[in-house]
């Protein structure tokens, strides 16, 4: 019962427990976030979307690169929105960051809008993986990159479908992505997914 409640909170943090979880995540996933950013080519003036921004730590790390980035974030959790908004208030006020609450299965952005999309420790919770990746594909520009990253153990625990690299690659290719590169270390796996048209 408690485990199910905590899993539900990890998918969509809410209330006091959600606030605590969101703050823990920002600290716990800092190392993963920095590793992902280090693995990623991020051109100056890129328009970036982070799906599942949690407490906002990845967006904060991206801003610290000082590359004049235009960053958007969407997260299903209102609690995550409030936490990230507090952390990123100055950047929100100067319009370099725009955050919203929403679902990856129905992204409120125009077609071909983003140069780079991050999904860190989040795709493992999506209800409809195919629909979610189709939506991401739609909002990506014709020469853009999707970065998917997660703890290996969480993939094994949460994903019954598309849990292996080959299954995920087949799904992404069927949607139209042209190249998938996998990188990993002892804890994490990262996919660099290219859209080229």
Task: Outline where the language-model segments fall.
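Conserved alpha-helix/loop element of class I SAM-dependent methyltransferases that forms part
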Residues: 27-44
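A short glycine-rich, Lys/Arg-flanked "PGG" loop and its adjoining helix->strand segment in the class I
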Residues: 130-142
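A short SAM/SAH-binding and catalytic strip from SAM-dependent methyltransferases
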Residues: 115-128
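Conserved beta-strand signature within the Rossmann-like core of class I S-adenosyl-L-methionine
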Residues: 143-151
